[in-house]
Amino acid sequence: LGQDPYHEPGQAMGLAFSVPAGVPLPPSLRNIFRELEDDTGVQPPRSGDLTAWAERGVLLLNPVLTVEGGKANSHADWGWQAVTDAILAALSALPQPIACVLWGAHAQKKAPLLQSGAPRLLLRAPHPSPLSSYRGFFGSRPFSQINAFLTAHGEPPIDWAL
C-alpha cells in the first residue's frame, strides 16, 4: 500500500510504485529494488514494471488513485479513499492469510481496515522515498517476512524476481 500515483507524465500505470517499461526508475522504486536485493538477493530489474508481481497475487494499491501532473497528493480529497477503503475492507473479510505492507504514514492509517478475518501480517515501514528511506525503510525486510508468513500458513511464497 502506497500513497498516490507518481505525478510526472508517463510514470503512473495503475499499480502502486510501478512505472511502464522504458521509463526511468523513480527514486522510491529504486529504493524498493535495493531493499529487495538486500532482503532476498534478487537482482534489481532494469524495468520498473511491476505487472509480474500483480499477476502473482500482489495488490499494488494506492489509497488515492489519481493525481494532478506535477503535484503529489493533489487529489487526496477527491473521494478515492472511500473506494480504496472498501477494497481493503473486502480483502480483510477474505478467509485466506493476507500479508500487507504499509509504506508511509498515509498507508499505515489503513491498518484498522485490514486487521479482521484470517491471519494477517501487517508490516509497517517508512515510505521508500529518499526523504524517509533511511528512517527504517532500509532494513525492514518486507519481502522475506511476507514469504515466511505465507509459508507458515500453508500458502506458496511469492517469486519476487521480475
Show where each model-derived region lies.
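A polyanion-binding, active-site-adjacent surface
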Residues: 1-124, 128-133, 139-161
